[in-house]
Amino acid sequence: MAVDNNKAKQAYDNQTGVNEQERKEQQQAQNNQPQFENKLTFSDEVVEKIAGIAAREVKGILDMKGGFTDSFTNAFSNGNNVTTGVSVEVGEKQAAVDLKVILEYGESAPKIFRKVTDLVKEQVKYITGLEVVEVNMQVDDVMTKKEWQQKNEKDNKENNEREGLK
């Protein structure tokens, strides 16, 4: 009976092209070949830009506020740097985001924080595939929309005057 089973198996293998020994040899040959590894990486600046754009989309965020180097950089640019007020740490699969913001007076900081956190995580994950494991938001100032607009107009006027001097 065992002989019949072997004949049946051999007939099946012949019909389907399955050969156990051949399969093992192919697998061993594949294991001996050098394996190529594909890798997709993102610079910190890319993740900063994504997080900055996402945070600015949330109602109640008037602006992002940078430190001294951002202020210095904005003095020599048009001031539309979307990475201002954003810093990140990017690993191979995860990222952490720190934001410095100016909130609109009368808006709920905890609600805005939840919305910003959700949107930043969603956008970074969608665009890069990176999991955002931490979002920290520091409120550096609170302004009314009118105060913020006046400050922006003043800053734009100063930038335009500086541009005229170049």
Swiss-Prot record:
The record's function comment reads: May play a key role in alkaline pH tolerance.
Record protein name field: Alkaline shock protein 23
Q: Which domain of life is it from?
A: Bacteria
Q: Which segments carry the region annotation Disordered?
A: 1-40, 144-166
**Compositional bias per record (Low complexity), positions renumbered to this chain:** 27-38
Q: Which residues form a coiled coil?
A: none
The family classification in the record reads: Belongs to the asp23 family.
Classification via InterPro entries:
Asp23
